[in-house]
Each structure stands twice: as structure tokens, then as C-alpha cells.
């Protein structure tokens, strides 16, 4: 669009003074065409010219409001090419007609100083009554240059982006330098490469998920401040919601380091970003409703000291204080009181009681009664009773948390090299539902003490070593009870420890259900403890992520026969098979008598073979029975094994003598012939 204005020359005004050539014919008081931010073009009066910064101030009246703005010189000349001086000619762009200015603009120009177009048009009159002012159209606007202010802004932005790129490069170089200075940089690089190429879709469980009386879950905690300071590596990967992988560092004979990736599969696996609410949703929450149906539920946290057991069960720590409102204790209590108000269970008229006690050094102490020593006895109905244990009635979640805080303040704890506030006892918090004085259901929440290796306590005091031994003994007994529960064995060795004895009603009975939360540390320095925890949990669940077929052997889950015994059993059974004696290739003769003599040998030895086979079977059963117990007698096992070996050696020696005599007779007969 273009606009043409005919502005009569005012006789009362003095002639315009020429400006400097680079400003062209722009003067104060003349009308120029300007472009608004909404792309509208109209006239405005020049009120000020800044020759130092090369900008012009213009004003106009719009809807009875006086407005103004600053415009750079180049923009003014692009919109008003007629104002450019002859000394600085500009090629005129293609023009198009614009709409005429409004009448208000024409009235305003009567009081303003007139301006004259420097390029006369062909239709200009001789008397100079009117002048044609052409405003360039869109092509001129497309070539519009940026103002100095915009140039400065763009320049600052480019400098800012350049600085940011340099800072990112510096940070990347620093991170690379830190990694290369790490003594385990090579292992860290191999772990990252393995995770980068890991395809979690190919990891699957051999056995389909089924409903079990026991649920085994694993939770990984993040690296703590101590491990980060020591530049420890995260060697635990959770590629899916039920698989945990451990990247163990190994070293070859030529000192070359490599990774041994071990895979474990469980019901659920949680990474270091999982919250307590998420863990509770898949572990303890499905068991809450069972206690309203006269069930006995147990949820316990197992793992190395400092792996996050107390954090999972109790909640967040702030120094030595613990926020119990975010742990499994509080979450279970919330659901219990929520179900208690449910119309289905409200008519049962149940009351909620809470108990809290610890098991330390094989003895039971009441944490709600100033650590009073308690006795564990069995009544006439063969029910285990903790004599003297206080049961306090609770009516809301706050009262439950109050009991937990009181008990945690009295619980036995010590400082260890791994954890400054390590629990040295098994804490058992029980939520009991009663109908009158009769127990309706019970939920036992167990925070186990951290298991320890003997190699980690060589420099510890004798008292602490005894603590660790007692802890490991009770954990072993707990594993055996869980194995018996998971395999539906007729006998559960709950008497092996005070821990399992107290939790007996949770291990026996048709309504018992158990959940295990194995907590692991991700650091490379805790690799051995992490593997022990995962193996413990894997023996409880016994699920493999393997391409090998699932095999059920003669030995119980988690137990294997010694290599020497297995090789001996295999060799003896193979050598005593009847078919092996029949297939002797070199015992041949044309005489029927010799053939019959050779063929009668297995018959003569059949009884010995049968006896030996029965002895092997009995031996295996004895070994299995002894290994299945918690307190098995090693001396007795060795003596029993030696006795069976002597019997087998005698039988094999007799067979050897008969074979040698037969071979000698065959050689003599062949020489005679």
C-alpha cells in the first residue's frame, strides 16, 4: 500500500535549513511515515533528532491521546526514501499505492511545519501547489534493518550462548578428569557400556508369576555421602520391575579386570528412586486385609547394616531423629484403621493393640516397658506366649507412631564402620486385632539387625563378635523357616532361634503369609555383602533368570552336595549298573560255556549291586536330612559318610577281584588254544 499527500506550502514559515547529508532532509516539525508494532503505517511529526545516536523522536495523536516513540534513522529513510539527500542516493524499491491518510492527520498538518519531498513526481504541478509523497510498500519493510538496540541485544545473547558453551565444555573436561583419576574408572566405564547396551525386554522369568505364601522383594538404596566421598561405584542395575543385576569386578591372571554380571529375579525389584509408599504398595499392603480374616501376616526387612532396613520400616532420618510418619509402620496403621471403619469389618467390633519388643543376644526385651526382660513359653494349647509383654490399645495412627517412637528410642544400637547408628537387635512391632479378649489377627513388622561377615569383624571387640554371631544364627534359622514355609514342608524348625519361636504363629497355619524386603547397598565396597543378601533372598524365593531348564535335585533348595561326594556317588552308581556288566566288549568266546559264565557274573553280583544302590540312596537321604536342619552335627555327618564309603569300598573291591579272576581265566584259555 502507498499513500500520497498533497501538502500546501505555508507562506508564513521560513525556508528549511539543510541538515547534514547523512540525515537527508529530515527536520523537526515535518511529517514522516512510520510503522507501528501491529504493522500499521501512518504519519507522525518529527519532534527531536539525535545526531549522536542516529535516532529520531516522532509524535502523533491517536483517539485524542498524544503518543510518541523513538525510531532509528535507517528505518525512517526506508519508509521515507524521498527524504534521502541526493548525495546519498538510494535505489527506490518497487512501490504500491497506499491508502490516504485520515482527515485528522490532514487537519493536524495545518499547524505543523510542512515538509517537502525531495523527489518530484511527473504529476507535480508547475506552481508547486502539491507534492507527491510515496511510502514504500512491503518489499522495503522486508529489507528493514535492525535498530542499534536490537543489535546490542542480539550481540549480548550471542556472547551469553558462547559463554554457556564454554562452561559446558569445561564441566565435561572436569568430569572426565575426575573419572580418569578414579582408581575404578575402567570398571565404571565397563558398567556404563553394559547398561547402555542392556535390553531389558529380553530379561524374563522362567516361571510365571504365581500366588505364593511368601513374597520376596529387593530394594536398592542410593549411594550415601560416605560412598560418594570415597568415589565408590554403583554396581547394581535394576533393568526391570523384578530383576536385579550385580556387576562384580574380577581380575584375571594377567591382571586384566573384567565384569562378572550376576542376575537375580524376585517378585518385585525397586531401584534407588522408589519411595516407601511404592515399596509398601507391593509388599505389606496386600497382607493387611488378611489379618481381618483371622490371618497371621509377617513383613520383615533383611539386609546388610546400613542398607536401609530401618529407613524402609520406620521412615526418614534427620540426624539421629526419625520421622516415623513415612515408614511401613505408619502406612500399615493407616490401612488398618481405614479397614476398621469399613462396613464389612465394622460389625466385627474389633479393637487394635500394639506391642513392641526386641530380641538381643537370644533374649527378649519389652521396648514399651523400659526394656523389661521377657520369657517366651508355650502354653497348653501349644501356642507361644511372650510372658509379661505389654499390649497397649491404640485408636488412631498418631498413637501407633507414638509407640514406635518410644520403642526406637530404647532399641539397642551401636556405631559400626559402615553405619553410625546401626541396629544390633531384631525389633518386632505387632499390630493385633482382638474381639474381646480373643485374638482375631496379627501383623508382625520385623526390622532385622544387619547381617555381618566374619571378615568384617576381625578387628572388633569380642562383645561385638558375639552380637554378630547371634544375629547370623537367628537369620539362618529364619531362612530355614521360610524355606519350610515356601516348600510346604511338614516340619518347620521354628525352635532354632528366639526370633522364629516368637514368630511361630506366622510360619505355621493355613492363614499365615510372609513378605520379605531385602535391602541392598549399591556400592562396590559392599559387593560381597550385597551378593550374600541376594543369595539369601534367592534361596528363599528360588527363581532363576537362566536359559538352563529348571531342575529339581535331591537336595533341598539352597543346599548342594560336596563335590567329592557328588563325584563319588556318580561314579559308584555308574559302575554298579547292571547294564554296564552286560556290555563288556572283549568277553567273547565261541564256546557257549564261557559265554554263560560271563553272563552269569552280573547275576551273581546283582544282590551286591542292589545293596550298594540302596546304600547310596539311603546315604543321599541321610545327607539331605542332616543338611536340612539348622544345628546339624558335622562330626556325625563325616562319620556317617565314612561308614557308607567303607561299605561301598568293600563291595567294589569284591567286584574288582572277581573281574580280575575272570580276566585271568580268559587269558589262560586263550594261550591253551
Curated annotation (Swiss-Prot):
GO terms for molecular function: ATP binding; ATP hydrolysis activity; microtubule binding; microtubule motor activity. It is found in: Cytoplasm, Cytoskeleton, Microtubule organizing center, Centrosome; Cytoplasm, Cytoskeleton, Spindle; Chromosome, Centromere, Kinetochore. GO terms for biological process: cell division; metaphase chromosome alignment; microtubule depolymerization; microtubule-based movement; regulation of chromosome segregation. Keywords: ATP-binding, Cell cycle, Cell division, Centromere, Chromosome, Coiled coil, Cytoplasm, Cytoskeleton, Kinetochore, Microtubule, Mitosis, Motor protein, Nucleotide-binding, Phosphoprotein. Residues 151-176, 640-666 form a coiled coil. Gene3D superfamilies: Kinesin motor domain. Highest level in lung. High level in ovary, moderate levels in heart, kidney, placenta, skeletal muscle and spleen (at protein level). Pancreas and spleen express a shorter isoform (at protein level). PROSITE patterns: KINESIN_MOTOR_1, KINESIN_MOTOR_2. The modification Phosphoserine is found at residue 204. ATP binds at residues 303-310. GO terms for cellular component: centrosome; cytoplasm; cytosol; kinesin complex; kinetochore; microtubule; spindle. Plus end-directed microtubule-dependent motor required for spindle assembly and chromosome movement. Has microtubule depolymerization activity. Plays a role in chromosome congression. Belongs to the TRAFAC class myosin-kinesin ATPase superfamily. Kinesin family. MCAK/KIF2 subfamily. This is Kinesin-like protein KIF2B. It comes from Homo sapiens. The gene is KIF2B.
Amino acid at each position: 500500500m502507498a499513500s500520497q499527500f498533497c501538502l500546501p506550502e505555508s507562506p508564513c514559515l521560513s525556508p528549511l535549513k539543510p541538515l547534514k547529508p547523512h540525515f537527508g532532509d529530515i527536520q523537526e516539525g515535518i511529517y514522516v511515515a512510520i510503522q507501528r508494532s501491529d504493522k500499521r503505517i501512518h504519519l507522525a511529526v518529527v519532534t527531536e533528532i539525535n545526531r549522536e545516536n542516529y535516532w529520531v523522536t516522532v509524535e502523533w495523536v491517536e483517539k485524542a491521546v498524544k503518543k510518541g516513540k523513538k525510531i532509528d534513522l535507517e528505518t525512517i529513510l526506508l519508509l521515507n526514501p524521498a527524504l534521502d539527500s541526493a548525495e546519498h542516493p538510494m535505489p527506490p524499491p518497487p512501490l504500491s499505492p497506499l491508502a490516504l491518510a485520515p482527515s485528522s492527520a490532514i487537519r493536524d498538518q495545518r499547524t505543523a511545519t510542512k515538509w517537502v519531498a525531495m523527489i518530484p513526481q511527473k504529476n507535480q504541478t508547475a506552481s508547486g501547489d502539491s507534492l507527491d509523497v510515496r511510502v514504500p510498500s512491503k518489499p522495503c519493510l522486508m529489507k528493514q534493518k535492525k535498530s542499534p538496540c536490537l543489535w546490542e541485544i542480539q550481540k549480548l545473547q550471542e556472547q551469553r550462548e558462547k559463554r554457556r558453551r564454554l562452561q559446558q565444555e569445561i564441566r565435561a573436561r572436569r568430569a572426565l578428569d575426575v573419572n580418569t583419576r578414579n582408581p575404578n574408572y575402567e570398571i565404571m566405564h565397563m558398567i556404563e557400556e553394559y547398561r547402555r547396551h542392556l535390553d531389558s525386554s529380553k530379561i524374563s522369568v522362567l516361571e510365571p508369576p504365581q500366588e505364593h505364601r511368601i513374597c520376596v522383594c529387593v530394594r536398592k538404596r542410593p549411594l550415601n555421602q560416605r560412598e560418594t566421598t570415597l568415589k565408590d561405584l554403583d554396581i547394581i542395575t535394576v533393568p526391570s520391575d523384578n530383576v536385579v543385576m550385580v556387576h562384580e569386578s574380577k581380575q584375571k591372571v594377567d591382571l586384566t579386570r573384567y565384569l562378572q554380571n550376576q542376575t537375580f529375579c524376585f517378585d518385585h525389584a525397586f531401584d534407588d528412586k522408589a519411595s516407601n509408599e511404592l515399596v509398601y504398595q507391593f509388599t505389606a499392603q496386600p497382607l493387611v486385609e488378611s489379618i481381618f480374616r483371622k490371618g497371621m501376616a509377617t513383613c520383615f526387612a533383611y539386609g546388610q547394616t546400613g542398607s536401609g532396613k530401618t529407613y524402609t520400616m520406620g521412615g526418614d532420618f534427620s540426624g539421629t531423629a526419625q520421622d516415623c510418619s513415612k515408614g511401613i509402620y505408619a502406612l500399615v496403621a493407616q490401612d488398618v484403621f481405614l479397614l476398621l471403619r469399613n462396613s464389612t469389618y465394622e460389625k466385627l467390633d474389633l479393637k487394635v493393640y500394639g506391642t513392641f519388643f526386641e530380641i538381643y543376644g537370644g533374649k527378649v526385651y519389652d521396648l514399651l516397658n523400659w526394656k523389661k526382660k521377657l520369657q517366651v513359653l508355650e502354653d497348653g494349647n501349644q501356642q507361644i506366649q511372650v510372658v509379661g509383654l505389654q499390649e497397649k490399645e491404640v485408636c488412631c495412627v498418631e498413637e501407633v507412631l507414638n509407640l514406635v517412637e518410644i520403642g526406637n528410642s530404647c532399641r539397642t544400637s551401636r556405631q559400626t564402620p559402615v553405619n553410625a547408628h546401626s541396629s544390633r537387635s531384631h525389633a518386632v512391632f505387632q499390630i493385633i486385632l482382638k474381639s474381646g479378649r480373643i485374638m482375631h489377627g496379627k501383623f508382625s513388622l520385623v526390622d532385622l539387625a544387619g547381617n555381618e561377615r566374619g571378615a568384617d569383624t576381625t578387628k572388633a571387640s569380642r562383645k561385638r563378635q558375639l552380637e554378630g554371631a547371634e544375629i547370623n544364627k537367628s537369620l539362618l534359622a529364619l531362612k530355614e523357616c521360610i524355606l519350610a514355609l515356601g516348600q510346604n514342608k511338614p516340619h518347620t524348625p521354628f525352635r532354632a532361634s528366639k526370633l522364629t519361636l516368637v514368630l511361630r504363629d506366622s510360619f505355621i497355619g493355613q492363614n499365615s503369609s510372609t513378605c520379605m524386603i531385602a535391602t541392598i547397598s549399591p556400592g562396590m565396597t559392599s559387593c560381597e555383602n550385597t551378593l550374600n543378601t541376594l543369595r539369601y533372598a534367592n534361596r528363599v524365593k528360588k527363581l532363576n533368570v537362566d536359559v538352563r531348564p529348571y531342575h529339581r535335585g535331591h537336595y533341598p533348595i539352597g543346599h548342594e552336595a560336596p563335590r567329592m561326594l557328588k563325584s563319588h556317588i556318580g561314579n559308584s552308581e555308574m559302575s554298579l549298573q547292571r547294564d554296564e556288566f552286560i556290555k563288556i566288549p572283549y568277553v567273547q568266546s565261541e564256546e557257549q560255556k564261557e559265554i554263560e559264565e560271563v553272563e552269569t557274573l552280573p547275576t551273581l553280583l546283582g544282590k551286591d549291586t542292589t545293596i550298594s544302590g540302596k546304600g547310596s540312596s539311603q546315604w543321599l537321604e541321610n545327607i539331605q536330612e542332616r543338611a536340612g536342619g539348622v544345628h546339624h552335627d558335622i562330626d556325625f555327618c563325616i562319620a556317617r559318610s565314612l561308614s557308607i564309603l567303607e561299605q561301598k569300598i568293600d563291595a567294589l573291591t569284591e567286584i574288582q577281584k572277581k573281574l580280575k579272576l575272570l580276566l585271568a581265566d580268559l587269558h589262560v584259555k586263550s594261550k591253551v588254544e
